[in-house]
């Protein structure tokens, strides 16, 4: 039987469309997804779960051979997205080697060039230790969180060694069902010293299926523990656990989701971007799509929404700037006030005025930064660049042209994904590209896909040729 995928969150319709077109089964679908796709009720256990990790990320989790394929199919379709995949599986089991001690924590090498942190550890450096991955290191710089309570994972349950507890998924809410499932699990592990976690799919399973899987996983765990006793070399991976990866949804990836959703139900432009805002904006999107179904043109709706957002931003004292980097970190720059808004056939241009508070040196420009300096930050809809134009009084200090995905202009927020490579323009008129190697590093790590990599290089070269046209001069506008 083909891979069964459980899909949840605000992207569910678009993601389901992509996966159904590729031949996957959608299992445990919500009522609205079954209705939209005319799907039969299928309560089969999920091989893979796809859900929102936050407003700008999709999480893909599940068995290897299934989840990794779903992940790759999604990033191929979304094209312009950041990719973060853990080099080790969630709940993978390792015979690790203790490399260091920091306080009451051990730093353990577990294989695949990964080191993890094992809390409450007083073992000596150089000793071997059997550990499981409780939290996988998905993004660059993250460390694996390790545990001595190792587990093997099935479709309905997980069996846990080192923690004889009985737990159940929070997604099983029916009290009688919870009591019934817990009773089944208790009868199978009583006196074994093992723990059981009942996964959400167990609510659809019969008693025999759960009991059979518990027996199979207990046997698998015994074999792993026995194997670990006879291994001489560490680190060694004993059990792969579950694949886990995140997809960073740029504005362009959200547009792709919009297009897939529109094939199923009428969808306004920027649906997924606007839906990630507050509840008020989400309700406005829902209302707008009712208008779309009643024949109001997509352009009229888009223009009206754009006007609403611009008027909202004009009325706000500050606009937040959210800058998402390829390492997965999110930086909130010091906010700005609206200095200028220009609408044209090309879209909207917003100029924010930011008064800088800190001392230092402007990156790449080699010019001293002083409190009171002004940054005129120019953001254009559909543009791959955001320029920072630094002034001290009427003196132009230089400009820093940031290359990024086209920004999302939202109520009170401007958000974009940084592509690392930038162009600096000195007050002498000299322009040069900086941080190209950093872009290349993230491309080689397969975090930035080829299309984004090539586009960033193309934009950087174009800026060099036309940089004089990109300098913002407030007194000449």
Swiss-Prot record:
It comes from the Archaea. The gene is fau-1. GO terms for molecular function: mRNA 3'-UTR AU-rich region binding; RNA endonuclease activity, producing 5'-phosphomonoesters. GO terms for biological process: rRNA processing. Disulfide bonds: none annotated. Keywords: Endonuclease, Hydrolase, Nuclease, RNA-binding, rRNA processing. Probable RNase involved in rRNA stability through maturation and/or degradation of precursor rRNAs. Binds to RNA in loop regions with AU-rich sequences. Its EC number is 3.1.26.-. Belongs to the FAU-1 family. InterPro entries: DUF402 (IPR007295), FomD-like_sf (IPR035930), Ntdp-like (IPR050212), RNA-bd_AU-1/RNase_E/G (IPR019307), RNA-bd_FAU-1 (IPR016730). The keyword Hydrolase applies. Pfam families: DUF402 (PF04167), RNase_E_G (PF10150). This is Probable ribonuclease FAU-1. The keyword RNA-binding applies.
């Amino acid at each position: 039987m083909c891979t069964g995928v459980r899909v949840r969150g605000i992207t569910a319709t678009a993601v389901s469309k992509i996966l159904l077109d590729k031949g996957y089964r959608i299992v445990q679908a919500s009522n609205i997804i079954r209705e939209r796709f005319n799907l039969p009720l299928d309560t089969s256990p999920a091989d893979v779960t796809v859900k929102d990790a936050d407003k700008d990320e999709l999480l893909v989790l599940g068995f290897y051979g299934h989840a990794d394929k779903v992940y790759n199919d999604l990033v191929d379709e979304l094209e312009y997205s950041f990719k973060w995949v853990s080099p080790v599986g969630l709940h993978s089991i390792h015979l690790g080697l203790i490399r260091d001690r920091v306080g009451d924590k051990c730093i353990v090498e577990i294989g695949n060039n990964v080191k993890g942190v094992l809390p409450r550890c007083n073992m000596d450096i150089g000793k071997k230790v059997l550990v499981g991955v409780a939290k996988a290191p998905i993004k660059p710089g993250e460390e694996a969180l390790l545990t001595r309570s190792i587990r093997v994972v099935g479709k309905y349950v997980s069996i846990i060694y080192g923690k004889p507890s009985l737990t159940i998924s929070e997604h099983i809410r029916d009290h009688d069902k919870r009591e019934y499932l817990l009773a089944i699990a208790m009868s199978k592990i009583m006196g074994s010293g093992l723990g059981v976690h009942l996964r959400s799919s167990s609510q659809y399973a019969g008693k025999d299926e759960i009991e059979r899987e518990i027996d199979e996983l207990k046997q698998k765990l015994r074999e792993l523990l026995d194997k670990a006793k006879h291994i001489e070399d560490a680190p060694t991976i004993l059990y792969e656990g579950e694949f886990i990866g995140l997809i960073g949804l740029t504005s362009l990836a959200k547009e792709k989701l919009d297009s897939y959703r529109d094939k199923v139900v009428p969808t306004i432009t920027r649906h997924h971007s606007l839906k990630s805002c507050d509840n008020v904006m989400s309700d406005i999107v829902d209302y707008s799509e009712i208008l779309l179904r009643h024949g109001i043109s997509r352009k009229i709706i888009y223009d009206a929404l754009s006007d609403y957002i611009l008027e909202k931003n004009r009325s706000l004292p500050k606009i937040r700037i959210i800058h998402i980097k390829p390492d997965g970190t999110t930086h909130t720059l010091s906010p700005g006030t609206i200095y200028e808004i220009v609408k044209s056939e090309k879209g909207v241009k917003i100029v924010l005025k930011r008064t800088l508070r800190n001392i230092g040196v402007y990156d790449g420009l080699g010019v001293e930064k002083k409190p009171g300096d002004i940054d005129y930050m120019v953001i254009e809809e559909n543009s791959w660049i955001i320029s920072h134009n630094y002034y001290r009084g009427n003196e132009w200090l230089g400009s820093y042209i940031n290359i990024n995905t086209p920004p999302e202009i939202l109520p009170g927020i401007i958000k974009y994904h940084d592509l690392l490579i930038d162009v600096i323009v000195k007050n002498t008129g000299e322009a040069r590209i900086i941080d190209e190697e950093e872009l290349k590093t993230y491309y080689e790590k397969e975090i930035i896909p080829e299309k984004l990599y090539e586009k960033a290089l193309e934009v950087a070269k174009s800026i060099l040729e036309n940089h004089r046209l990109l300098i913002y001069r407030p007194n000449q506008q």
